[in-house]
Amino acid sequence: MSSDSPAAGDGGEQAAAGTSVPSPSYDKQKEKARVSRTSLILWHAHQNDAAAVRKLLEEDPTLVHARDYDKRTPLHVASLHGWIDVVKCLLEFGADVNAQDRWKNTPLADAEGARKQKMIELLKSHGGLSYGQNGSHFEPKPVPPPIPKKCDWEIEPAELDFSNAAMIGKGSFGEIVKAYWRGTPVAVKRILPSLSDDRLVIQDFRHEVDLLVKLRHPNIVQFLGAVTERKPLMLITEYLRGGDLHQYLKEKGGLTPTTAVNFALDIARGMTYLHNEPNVIIHRDLKPRNVLLVNSSADHLKVGDFGLSKLIKVQNSHDVYKMTGETGSYRYMAPEVFKHRRYDKKVDVFSFAMILYEMLEGEPPFANHEPYEAAKHVSDGHRPTFRSKGCTPDLRELIVKCWDADMNQRPSFLDILKRLEKIKETLPSDHHWGLFTS
């Protein structure tokens, strides 16, 4: 981890007294170091690593006021998870006990929402107040479903048959199982009963349902309904028999250019739909695990999992949003997200480039790095190396454009679609491909 030396900092302030003005490269190095430390302190606060948090604060005490995209401080993060030692360290270094995030929640409000009793007592002893949507000073109101009253997507829990349920996936908020609804196999995201009263969880659940209700496209996983009036909360989508792209690539390895382009076209069609103005939906977590195969024949893909997506009303096509948190998966993360800078829908284009690279190469980008280190490597300007003979010059050029460090230089998904269609015309069918590569 790089850090700014005190001598260098003093020299910059004394430039008027005769020392030279720092070069642009020096300024860039300082910016990289600052961004890296901001990311690290939020990460270590989340991981309950008090020693690492202390080390960072000793090097740069201003990091105690670091913020992510949602304006959450390290104190918010640690308080939510109940990490006592981390919170004590942050308070020792002068953390604002009543800092408010974008929803006006204080750390105490988060601790109350997560029912962390010891944390609640600790924060109160340091003058913590409970304000925001999650706090005790917020007037409790019943949580309505995204579309009010008797909507036709509300599903009665009794209609769901879990007698032969099979686990598909599991996360911190709940699990996804294959079940049956009116005789049809479906995928059910089921929120853990212990979290069904958590306002933050309910807020995220409502957001995902509200988003999915609006989506209708052949390359987007189809929303079928939800259980919002009883516990546990459940979200029901179509069940896709082919599994996810991550598992498919793990089993198959690198794909032929023709197959990779066909897969990429499906992803790009879905993303073009999501990015359509004026209601732009930024996925923010586009990765192989969130791309699903319709069947075992793998002839059709759909984009799914909108838990981290954001619906943005665009005033003009060049709008950039103040979204600076490390939202999404590190290995596929755009550098501007990792660096906590302003970003827009082009973050999805970057992730798409990494997926297309993985489809052709047969392994994840920077597979020999841990996910966080891979994201840091990318933010420092590095990109994965092309090794596959199947990566044609046209495909390589497209990938390089899509993972450009400057988000403004990345093409739109509509442009990507046009490029892919042209590339597809130049490729042989799969059963002829071996003749060209043997």
UniProtKB/Swiss-Prot annotation:
Alphabetical list of Gene3D superfamilies matching this protein: Ankyrin repeat-containing domain, Phosphorylase Kinase, domain 1, Transferase(Phosphotransferase) domain 1
E.C. numbers: 2.7.11.1
PTM: Phosphorylated.
Keyword ATP-binding on entry: yes
Location of this chain's protein in the cell: Vacuole
Gene Ontology MF terms in the entry: ATP binding; MAP kinase kinase kinase activity; protein serine/threonine/tyrosine kinase activity
Disruption phenotype: Reduced sensitivity to auxin (e.g. 2,4-D and NPA) and brassinosteroids (BRs) associated with altered vein pattern in foliar organs. Decreased vacuolar sugar import associated with reduced fresh weight when grown on high glucose containing medium or in response to cold stress. Altered intracellular sugar compartmentation due to altered regulation of MSSP1/TMT1.
Region annotation (Disordered) ranges: 1-31
Classification via InterPro entries: Ankyrin_rpt, Ankyrin_rpt-contain_sf, Kinase-like_dom_sf, Prot_kinase_dom, Protein_kinase_ATP_BS, Ser-Thr/Tyr_kinase_cat_dom, Ser/Thr_kinase_AS, Ser/Thr_Kinases-Pseudokinases
GO biological process: auxin-activated signaling pathway; brassinosteroid mediated signaling pathway; cellular response to glucose stimulus; leaf vascular tissue pattern formation; positive regulation of D-glucose transmembrane transport; response to auxin; response to salt
Gene Ontology CC terms: extracellular region; plant-type vacuole
Residues forming the catalytic site: 285
Domain Protein kinase: from-to ranges: 162-427
Tissue expression from the record: Restricted to mature vascular cells. Mostly expressed in mature leaves and seeds, and, to a lower level, in seedlings, young leaves, flowers and siliques.
Keywords: ANK repeat, ATP-binding, Kinase, Nucleotide-binding, Phosphoprotein, Repeat, Serine/threonine-protein kinase, Transferase, Vacuole
Start and stop residues of the ANK repeats: 36-65, 70-99, 103-133
Chemical reaction(s) catalysed: L-seryl-[protein] + ATP = O-phospho-L-seryl-[protein] + ADP + H(+); L-threonyl-[protein] + ATP = O-phospho-L-threonyl-[protein] + ADP + H(+)
Residues that, per the record, bind ATP: 168-176, 189
SUPFAM superfamilies the UniProt entry points to: Ankyrin repeat, Protein kinase-like (PK-like)
Function noted in UniProt: Serine/threonine protein kinase which may function as an adapter protein for BRL2. Required during vascular development for the establishment of vein pattern in foliar organs. Mediates MSSP1/TMT1 phosphorylation and activation to enhance its carrier activity and consequently vacuolar sugar accumulation, particularly in response to cold.
Assembly and oligomerization: Interacts with BRL2. Binds to MSSP1/TMT1 at the tonoplast.
Family from the record: Belongs to the protein kinase superfamily. Ser/Thr protein kinase family.
Protein name: Serine/threonine-protein kinase VIK
Species: Arabidopsis thaliana (Mouse-ear cress)
Originating gene: VIK
